[in-house]
Amino acid sequence: GRQLDYFINSGKPYIGYFIVFGTSLVMAIIDTVLLCTMKEKPSLSPAKLNLASLAMPLRDTKYRGFILVLIIWSFTIGLGTPFLPVHLLRNLQLSHTFITAMGIASAVAAMLGTWLWGRMADRYSWQKVFQNAGLVVAAGYICWGFVSKETAVFAAPVIMCAVEGCNGAFNTASLNLQYFESPQSGKTVYLGVTSALANISSVLAVMAGTLITTLLSPIIGEATFNVLLTSSGILCVAVLMTYRLLYKHSHANIR
């Protein structure tokens, strides 16, 4: 972050961006090599799968409702998340150094949050974690809509740490609930299809968010990002309410 600010202020932004890109590329290659060297335990009962198997999660009436909740959640989160860095830099005028520092702090908050939410899951249920962590994430997005240049230095780190401290726990709870809802045989298909559809939903959300910002920017200017982020948070609350209506009792004791 500091080197990026230095090169931008020196009128050589592309050097800073190239350093960031090069570092990220090297780390990605190392990560790929390490993943490829990991040993997997062979499956004791290999399943025979075909293209028709990919439709199994959608045909399963028990699982279909939950996969729909996750698809809509991915869409609502995808509406605002990709535009947050632009909002931080352009509208709130925070430096790359400050944003990087927030990223480090939020990573620490994520580790601490995972431990705290894990204890909550052990004591209560993954449903409680899914709902409560999701509410904090939604509240964070709603709060982004009310952060101004004057309050950004104080409010932005708090919101980012709160959201990241709950985001990992929400995803872990989601995975455990998917595991519970899917049948004993074919869990890989269920989880894989869910992940794929959620990612497709996120891509569509980015396209929708881009269209919204294009239409609203000439009308309300910088407030476009505030509206987009707040709307994303409100929609997240609606998704969580829908989940509660569908699975209030069936997920109550999953640990």
Predicted segments — roles?
Residues 82-99:
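Short amphipathic helix-loop junctions that connect adjacent transmembrane helices
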Residues 153-170:
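Hydrophobic core of transmembrane alpha-helices in multi-pass small-molecule transporters
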Residues 4-26, 213-234:
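A membrane-interface helix-boundary motif in multi-pass transporters
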Residues 135-151:
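C-terminal ends and interior cores of transmembrane alpha-helices
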Residues 169-183:
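Intracellular juxtamembrane helix-capping segments at the cytosolic ends
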Residues 27-38, 230-255:
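Multi-pass alpha-helical transporter architecture, strongest
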Residues 40-68, 255:
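Juxtamembrane intracellular "pre-TM" segments in multi-pass secondary transporters
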Residues 4, 113-126, 213:
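Helix-to-loop junctions at the C-terminal end of transmembrane segments
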